[in-house]
Amino acid sequence: MIPKGGSEGDSNSSMWFAGDVEHIIRTQQSARVAIDPKWGVAALLSLAVLWAFAPSGLWLLLFIGVIVLCHEAGHLVVARRAGMRPTEFFWGFGPEIVAFEHNGCRYGVKAIFLGGYVKLHGMTPTSELPPGFAEQDTYRGASHAGRLATILAGPVVNLVMAVVAFAVAARLAGGSIGGSALTGFDHLWFVIAGTGEALWTWVTSIGTYVGSVFDTSGATEAPVRFMSPVSQAEVTGGAVADGWITSLRWFGILSCAIGAVNLLPLPPLDGAHALVAASEWISQKVRRDRSVRVDVRRLEPLAYLTVFVLVGLSLSALVLDLRDVGIG
């Protein structure tokens, strides 16, 4: 229909202009930043108190924050590449401090700076989807390869970050690795091999440490033990004070540890989701039945047990740290 007093060309021009304005409005609305001042002020005050009384703790929070942010970014990027549609990407938990929406995903920072997450719908075979959410955009709607890649992306990013941190530290130190002078990145393999050796040592020491927790005789002591947040903060502060090289090495150790822990096949860690996806894939290949599904919610009791054990190990490490300094 042509408006009164105009031509067909004017009508098309008007329709294009109106559509362009509508697109701009929608873009501005989707990218609108939401800020909650009260939680922002509360978070800043908490950080200020931490800096005043325990600056090492703030440095640890920063190190862990960067590692977790990159970990979750790995999940996010690969999930999109696999055809999934993430709906949330947040650093921290609790109330939102600042957030904005872009391409159907809400990004932001929350008040408790301990961790982060990417929200994917359809993580279980029977979970309900939001209205209008397509099945092919979900985690369960992706291919097995896509699901495995998405789950493993986070830990892999952490391990790559560790290798890079160790390599840069070695480069800055101007030393050698394995008796070979490191004049460039040609000897990066030595760093990767050293990272793998450190990982294996860490994993094999867990059993020894768990045994030492319940050993009341005091006759033996584990050569390696879990570090409580207190000792982690102390080491982080010392690394920062020592300079870039020590800081990079400690950052690499933390990143490597977080990646390794997430690879353990225990819910709610990434390794458990990877194990479920792999078992479904293998079962469907062997039985030639694409309807085979494993509901990760059946592993909830094991998830509670895992959390209980991790909290227990952390508390025991804290007790040992306090005992070392003469408290308790």
Predicted features and spans:
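Long, highly hydrophobic alpha-helical transmembrane signal-anchor segments
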Residues: 37-85, 221-250, 325-328
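Membrane-interface motifs of alpha-helical transmembrane segments
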Residues: 88-91, 104, 291-307
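Internal alpha-helical transmembrane segments
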Residues: 59, 69-70, 76, 80-81, ...
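Small-residue-rich helix-interface/hinge motifs
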Residues: 2, 10-25, 56-134, 254, ...
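Transmembrane alpha-helices
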Residues: 1, 16-58, 315
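Functional transmembrane alpha-helices
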Residues: 20, 134-149, 167-258, 278-301, ...
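Core segments of transmembrane alpha-helices
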Residues: 40-42, 155-162, 224-232, 306-310
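Final/C-terminal transmembrane alpha-helix of multipass membrane proteins
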Residues: 47-48, 163-164, 298-322
